[in-house]
A protein has these predicted regions:
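Aromatic- and glycine-enriched pocket-lining scaffold segments that form the walls
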Residues: 194-239
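Short coil/linker segments at helix-helix boundaries
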Residues: 143-174, 190-198
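Short coil/turn linking the two alpha-helices of tandem helical-hairpin repeats
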Residues: 139-149, 187, 218-221
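Conserved, well-structured interaction surfaces
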Residues: 32, 70-144, 159-164, 176-177, ...
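Hydrophobic-face positions in mid-chain alpha helices that act as interaction patches
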Residues: 220-266
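Membrane-proximal, proline-rich intrinsically disordered regions
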Residues: 6-57
Length: 266
């Protein structure tokens, strides 16, 4: 007598997914998923971030009877001090580094993929990831400032050191400049869709240079700031709506704009 049975194909655990499959030979669809995840994640905890930097910067006053820390801690009421382990610090910190993780995964995936993309598209895609990564690290820096930030976080089991303020800015500028070199003169489209300004590498370069100009100002490198601005989307005679945006919607499963409040809302 003999017995036969169906073969069982191995299935990845959906509750504990691994990045190894994506980083070793990602499909175009998987590359797109990484981009969607990064751009969706860029919107997380923006309310905490902008409440923090805006209230401390005296750009607005946050009326919220549910949490006195928004005026107490952030405005230094009485003897109040900023808390290094509360929502206005840890939430945006974690959210930004999650996107950095996505960007690092995308870079590795693009380096190793055997999908039908050109070398120019591969370079442009990596430049996109580096630009997004620099944007997120700059937001972390804006809240940490003199504390400095970690730049090297590619290996979660062996994190790089916290850099000084100047070292952090220099590292972010270098990241943007590396991306710029791979975008400049690269007349291709990314091998994925993006909501960030343009899918064309030469157009996306303008976003990269806008960020580079901002970092250059922080570094007091006025010459680089002016040069970068001239290569960005800035146009003194252009439309005030030209630029790069976060996208929100009321569709199921998507996010509403967390810093929009209807007029006269209590």
């Amino acid at each position: 007598l003999g017995w036969s049975a169906c073969t069982v194909d191995p299935v990845a655990d959906p509750n504990n997914p691994s990045t190894s499959g994506i980083t070793q030979n990602a499909t175009i669809g998987e590359l797109q998923n990484l981009v969607v995840g990064a751009e969706a994640g860029m919107r997380n905890s923006l309310n905490n971030y902008y409440d923090g930097v805006s209230v401390i910067g005296r750009e607005y006053y946050r009326f919220a009877t549910s949490d006195p820390r928004l005026t107490g801690d952030l405005l230094g009421k009485g003897s109040a001090m900023l808390d290094n382990n509360t929502f206005y610090t840890t939430n945006p910190f974690n959210a930004r580094y999650r996107v950095v993780k996505n960007a690092n995964t995308l870079i590795t995936a693009l380096q190793n993929t055997k999908a039908a993309i050109t070398d120019g598209q591969r370079k442009a895609g990596i430049a996109y990831a580096k630009t997004v990564k620099a944007h997120e690290l700059l937001m972390v820096f804006n809240q940490q400032y003199e504390n400095g930030i970690r730049i090297d976080v590619d290996d979660p089991d062996k994190l790089g050191p916290f850099l000084s303020k100047d070292e952090s800015l220099n590292a972010i500028q270098n990241l943007l400049n590396e991306a710029y070199l791979d975008l400049k003169g690269n007349d291709v489209e990314f091998p994925f869709a993006t909501t960030l300004y343009s899918k064309k590498a030469l157009e996306f370069l303008k976003f990269n240079r806008a960020l580079a100009a901002r970092v250059a100002v922080f570094r007091k490198d006025w010459a680089l700031a002016l040069t970068a601005l001239n290569e960005s989307f800035l146009d003194l005679n252009g439309s005030l709506t030209d630029g790069v945006y976060y996208l929100f919607s009321t569709q199921g499963g998507d996010l509403l704009n967390p810093i929009f409040f209807p007029q006269d809302t209590p």
